[in-house]
């Protein structure tokens, strides 16, 4: 599969995978750091983690301000103050919102753009979004701003922010930003519901769509001094810690949290990016506070010592990721002295202990680095708000002109080409991974490709190499049962594409049999590439890609402003003015010679092979310095080396893809055939199913969303049934991969999810050809079958998937928590054991037959579709599957146990002996509550968010991931505080006590809260809930969440807003005290890592030196230490504990 991105998805810190490929990547163990969502330019495998500040990772990108080292605006104006403004007035006439016509934008984009260059050299892009303003221009008053409906979007930053989770609908929520395998469970849990809940609820913790800013400094980790590895990343952290004008250490975060905002930063190889968003009313003040990072940050010594620990925790979280390990190993292959070989992360050793030993003053060096490299003429700034361009220009000029310009040239690494032109590169590297996986990655180091952005040669090659249709590499390997997934291309991170080189990688997830034939797999890749080289670039293929990308750009949906500005500030460093918005998406010119030049370098003699497998253990005698990766270096076997060096034959089964029949050509907006409604209405209701429908009349794009939930009571009857269902959905996905791939690349996306209570089918894209894809999916479902070879291949991979989920502390902690709370839930360990006990193909086919025989089907169709067409979708499902209705109505949730009063602790050992990371969650159960109380809980957690981060992370330095969470567990409310820590630094019980200490201090804090501060927070939450949707997908997600949970409260936000308006400070204080008092129901879950502060069962300190995981997947309960022994009730057998508890009634939060 190739990588595809939209304009928003390119953003550095949002490393999401394409929905169509994410579940495959996860199941098959591909470590993807993709930044894709809907489509556009190809993105490769792997996109790897890089250091970031606190909520997301950094990306590595390309270097110079422009490909030719020029400013964006050779012919553009410099922003002026005072009298010079009249000159600009004459240039644009009297319009206060006239944009720059030379900036090419999508016809669907309502925003206006203006480029300015300040007198200090800083370049800025101003974005005015006055859409939905009903003719308003200019500055609105504060009163208007208070009443104005404002927009927002989702935010994926969960490590320090308040979260709202639907536990019943979550998969594994706390995405580890450094863990590329965080989606391993996408095909094995009801992640469809988790994603919906996270998207819908994350919107409530983000900001107004209209107000966001991002600044890119054109310097990154390549500039790290040799004696202080990680200094650039550390500086990115430290500028947040107070400024001369605003000295409070956590002041900026506190200001944003108070006004519904969020912020983040990321360090790249040659760039560093900062971004934030906030309610429009507070945007100017936020800009002023934020600009102080670059004007006069304090960086006091005391803060330095504490923030080193945050950087170190970030590094510790990154260590168990195979993607990060592979990246560090790959970098170590660079020739000596090349910056690709640097340790970008930094840790306590490189930033504190070693400097002290060598009499290096980190504080002084940090300030020197800031003065040398944080210069205004290296910076590109993007601001977006619902203000006029003139207003934004005035603000930016006034605030950001204060950033100093040192006049020094930016460091240039462009002369350091060919970093991997070494004898060690063209070898076979065997690597022992953390997870259970077989994977082969073939990599070539090419000359820098950024200057060819108008042709995008690597995108063209990725399109073909990553194709999954007939004649493709993956199609051939799947037929042999040697491979499960393939990702190819370049991720456009700075690690993969910079001023010194560009990478092209092909990574293949192998089956057990494929591992045994990995040389043949590599040979198949080389045969395909030789076929492409022999044919040469094909204009038909190029034009097909261009047409698809042009369609997507023309009908582009709006995106989250904070992601958008982040992407744009990086684009300003890469593309000329006219291509800022298009340079990363569109194919402009067909130049076969440019494509051919890149293609002809992809030969076996220049390839690096990395083979990941647990079978390599014992064969690898080398160890990478920073991440401890075990590996070995071998020459390519002589017989294969000789074959690859010869004029080998082509494979007749490998050929170019046929013409794509799924590309849309009809973009007509359809007329209504029934009355327009604000919310979905039920247009079909039968014993076999029902259908909800809403015709879009807001976004006016020729796209549609189709969602169906095929509900069956059969799934949850046993752990074996749950596993059979997982196998079924994954084989169905496997069967569809080849025939549906053309639809996927034509922007028609689909996803099949093995939900807790049924099969979830999601389809979206241009409505013209969408019915073809939907019918294809239902046809394959109706005619489901599997060969013994495919069954064996899928079950073996599923064992690895379950294992890889369980060895992550955060996902094991969730599994344990939900196993305690949800009655009759089958845990991941139960599923793993059922799979290990053995299941047959016959049992699968029998299960599928029974599953399809009796169902209730519930659907939602929204977008550019008529009601008649919508009903046809449901009719097709019913007619094709020909099933009987369910005998009785089936709840789509679990029953939840009622926790006894008191503090209960379940403490278990992590399953990865090489992982120091621990996860500590303290949960308070509330019970069956009303919608009003649910909203009050949201408000509580919103108040809790910033002080929680400040106390537990900033001051106590307990860990990198620290956050409070609202929890909705099958309709039962609660809240929790989670800290990710390390056993090399803290005992989990110490962390638990610190969480309790925080909660006690928080009680005092809210008691002393002023009415003004309380009302400010209420207003902020109301604003977030009032925000209009940015694009149709957000509205669909929110409505689908109501359908799939069978709550149907489509105007939920309006009810929550009304509830918020009725709250008083005493409501908040009393609610919190009631849940913290003597009768509180408290559950602590500890997953304990390996390190000197944690003990083994025999009382000896545990060690994290091992690189292995437990082969027997079972919970190891740990005793409570004297620290908590007097105040807690230990849980040492979950089943025994829960069988004694009462069950709460099924409950839905609808009143």
UniProtKB/Swiss-Prot annotation:
Its cofactor is Zn(2+). Residues 53-108, 133-207 are annotated as: Disordered. Its EC number is 3.4.24.61. Keywords: Cell projection, Hydrolase, Metal-binding, Metalloprotease, Mitochondrion, Phosphoprotein, Protease, Signal, Zinc. Coiled coil: none annotated. One of its GO terms (biological process) is positive regulation of membrane protein ectodomain proteolysis. InterPro entries: Metalloenz_LuxS/M16 (IPR011249), Pept_M16_N (IPR011765), Pept_M16_Zn_BS (IPR001431), Peptidase_M16 (IPR050626), Peptidase_M16_C (IPR007863), Peptidase_M16_M (IPR032632). One of its GO terms (molecular function) is metalloendopeptidase activity. Zn(2+) binds at residues 233, 237, 314. GO terms for cellular component: cell surface; cytosol; dendrite; mitochondrial matrix. The keyword Zinc applies. The modification Phosphoserine is found at residues 86, 94, 96. Residues 1-20 form the signal peptide. The active site is at residue 236. Its main location: mitochondrion. It is an enzyme of class 3 (hydrolase). Residues 141-198 have a biased composition (Acidic residues). Binds 1 zinc ion per subunit. Cleaves peptide substrates on the N-terminus of arginine residues in dibasic pairs. Is a critical activator of BACE1- and ADAM17-mediated pro-neuregulin ectodomain shedding, involved in the positive regulation of axonal maturation and myelination. Required for proper functioning of 2-oxoglutarate dehydrogenase (OGDH). Interacts with BACE1 and NRG1. PANTHER family: INSULIN-DEGRADING ENZYME-RELATED, NARDILYSIN. Belongs to the peptidase M16 family. This is Nardilysin.
């Amino acid at each position: 599969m190739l990588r595809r991105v939209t304009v928003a998805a390119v953003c550095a810190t949002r490393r999401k995978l394409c929905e169509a490929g994410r579940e495959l990547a996860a199941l098959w163990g591909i470590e993807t750091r993709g930044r894709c969502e809907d489509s556009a330019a190809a993105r490769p495998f792997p996109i790897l983690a890089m250091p970031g500040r606190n909520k997301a990772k950094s990306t590595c990108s390309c270097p110079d301000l422009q490909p030719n080292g020029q400013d964006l605006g050779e012919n553009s104006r410099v922003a002026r103050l005072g009298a010079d403004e009249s000159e600009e007035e004459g240039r644009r006439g009297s319009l206060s919102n006239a944009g720059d016509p030379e900036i090419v934008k999508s016809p669907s984009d309502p925003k206006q753009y203006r480029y300015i260059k300040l007198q200090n050299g800083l370049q800025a892009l101003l974005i005015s979004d006055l859409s939905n303003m009903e003719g308003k221009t200019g500055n609105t008053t504060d009163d208007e701003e208070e009443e104005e409906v404002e927009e927002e979007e989702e935010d994926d930053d969960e490590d320090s922010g308040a979260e709202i989770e639907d536990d019943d609908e979550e998969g594994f929520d706390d995405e580890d930003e450094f863990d590329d395998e965080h989606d391993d469970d996408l095909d094995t849990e009801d992640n469809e519901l988790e994603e919906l809940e996270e998207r819908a609820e994350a919107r409530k913790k983000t900001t107004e769509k209209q107000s966001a800013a991002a600044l890119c400094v054109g310097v990154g980790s390549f500039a790290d001094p040799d004696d202080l590895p990680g200094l650039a990343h550390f500086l990115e952290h430290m500028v947040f810690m107070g400024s001369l004008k605003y000295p409070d250490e956590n002041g900026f975060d506190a200001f944003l949290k108070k006004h519904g905002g969020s912020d983040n930063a990321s360090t790249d190889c040659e760039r560093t990016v900062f971004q934030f968003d906030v309610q429009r009313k507070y945007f100017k003040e936020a800009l002023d506070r934020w600009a102080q990072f670059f004007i006069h940050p304090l960086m006091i010594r005391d803060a330095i010592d504490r923030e080193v620990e945050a950087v170190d925790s970030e590094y510790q979280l990154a260590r168990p990721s195979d993607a990060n390990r592979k990246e560090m190993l790959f970098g170590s292959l660079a020739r000596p002295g090349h910056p690709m070989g640097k340790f970008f992360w930094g840790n306590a050793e490189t930033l504190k202990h070693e400097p002290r030993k060598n009499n290096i003053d980190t504080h002084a060096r940090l300030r020197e680095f800031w003065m040398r490299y944080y210069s205004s003429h290296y910076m590109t700034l993007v601001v977006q708000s619902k203000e006029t361009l003139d207003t934004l220009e005035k603000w930016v000029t006034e605030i950001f002109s204060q950033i100093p310009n040192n006049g020094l040239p930016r460091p240039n690494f462009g002369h350091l080409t060919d970093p991997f032109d070494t004898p060690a590169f063209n070898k076979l590297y065997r690597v022992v991974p953390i997870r259970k996986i077989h994977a082969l990655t073939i990599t070539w180091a090419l000359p820098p490709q950024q200057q060819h952005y108008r042709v995008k040669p690597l995108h063209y090659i990725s399109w073909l190499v990553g194709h999954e249709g007939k004649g493709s590499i993956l199609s051939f390997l799947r037929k042999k049962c040697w491979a499960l997934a393939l990702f190819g291309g370049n991720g456009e991170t700075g690690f993969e594409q910079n001023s010194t080189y560009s990478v092209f990688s092909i990574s293949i997830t192998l089956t057990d049999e494929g591992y045994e034939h990995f040389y043949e797999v590599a040979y198949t890749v080389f045969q395909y590439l030789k076929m492409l080289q022999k044919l040469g670039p094909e204009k038909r293929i190029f034009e097909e890609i261009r047409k698809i990308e042009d369609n997507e750009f023309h009908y582009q949906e709006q995106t989250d402003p904070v992601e958008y500005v982040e992407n744009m500030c990086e684009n300003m460093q890469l593309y000329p003015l006219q291509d800022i918005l298009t340079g990363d998406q569109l194919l402009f010119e067909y130049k076969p010679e440019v494509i051919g030049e890149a293609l002809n370098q992809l030969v076996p003699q220049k390839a690096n092979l990395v083979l990941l497998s647990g079978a390599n253990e014992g064969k690898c005698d080398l160890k990478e310095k920073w991440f401890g990766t075990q590996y070995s270096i071998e020459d390519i076997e002589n017989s294969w080396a000789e074959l690859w060096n010869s004029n080998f034959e082509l494979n007749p089964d490998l050929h170019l893809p046929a013409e794509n029949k799924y590309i849309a050509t009809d973009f007509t907006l359809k007329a209504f055939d029934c009355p327009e409604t604000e919310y979905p209405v039920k247009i079909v209701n039968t014993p076999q199913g029902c259908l909800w429908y809403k015709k879009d009349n807001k976004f006016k794009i020729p796209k549609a969303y189709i969602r169906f939930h095929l509900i069956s009571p059969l799934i949850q009857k046993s752990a074996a049934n749950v596993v059979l269902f997982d196998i079924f959905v994954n084989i169905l996905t496997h069967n569809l991969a080849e025939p549906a791939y053309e639809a996927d690349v034509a922007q028609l996306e689909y996803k099949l999810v093995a939900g807790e209570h049924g099969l979830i089918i999601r389809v979206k894209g241009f409505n013209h050809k969408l019915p073809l894809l939907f019918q294809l999916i239902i046809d394959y479902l109706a005619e489901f079958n599997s060969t013994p070879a495919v069954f064996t291949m899928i079950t073996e991979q599923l064992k690895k998937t379950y294992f890889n989920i369980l060895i992550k502390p955060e996902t094991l902690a969730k599994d344990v928590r939900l196993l305690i709370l949800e009655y009759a839930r089958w845990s991941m360990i139960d599923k793993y054991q059922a799979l290990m006990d053995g299941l047959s193909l016959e049992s699968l086919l029998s299960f599928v037959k029974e599953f399809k025989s009796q169902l209730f089907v519930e659907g939602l169709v929204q977008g550019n579709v008529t009601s008649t067409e919508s009903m046809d979708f449901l009719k097709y499902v019913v007619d094709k599957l020909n099933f009987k209705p369910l005998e009785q109505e089936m709840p789509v949730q679990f029953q939840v146990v009622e926790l006894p009063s008191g503090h209960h602790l379940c403490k278990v050992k992590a399953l990865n002996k090489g992982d120091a990371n621990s996860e500590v969650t303290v949960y308070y159960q509330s019970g069956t509550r009303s919608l009003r109380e649910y909203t009050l809980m949201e408000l509580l957690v919103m108040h809790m968010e910033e002080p929680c981060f400040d106390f537990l992370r900033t001051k106590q330095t307990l860990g990198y991931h620290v956050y409070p969470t609202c929890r909705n567990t099958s309709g039962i409310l609660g809240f929790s505080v989670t800290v990710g820590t390390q056993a090399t630094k803290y005992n989990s019980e110490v962390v638990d006590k610190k969480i309790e200490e925080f909660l006690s201090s928080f009680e005092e804090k809210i008691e002393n809260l002023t009415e003004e501060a309380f009302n400010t927070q209420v207003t902020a939450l109301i604003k977030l809930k009032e925000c209009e949707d940015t694009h149709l997908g957000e509205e669909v997600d929110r409505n689908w969440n109501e359908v799939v949970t069978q709550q149907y409260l489509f105007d939920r936000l309006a009810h929550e807003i009304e509830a918020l308006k009725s709250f008083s400070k005493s409501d908040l204080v009393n609610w919190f005290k009631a849940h913290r008092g003597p009768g509180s129901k408290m559950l602590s879950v500890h997953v304990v890592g390996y390190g000197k502060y944690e003990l083994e069962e025999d009382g000896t300190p545990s060690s994290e030196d091992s690189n292995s995981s437990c082969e027997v997947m079972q919970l190891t309960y740990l005793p409570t230490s004297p620290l908590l022994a007097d105040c807690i009730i230990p849980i040492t057998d979950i089943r025994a504990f829960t069988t004694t508890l009462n069950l709460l009634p099924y409950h839905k939060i609808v009143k």
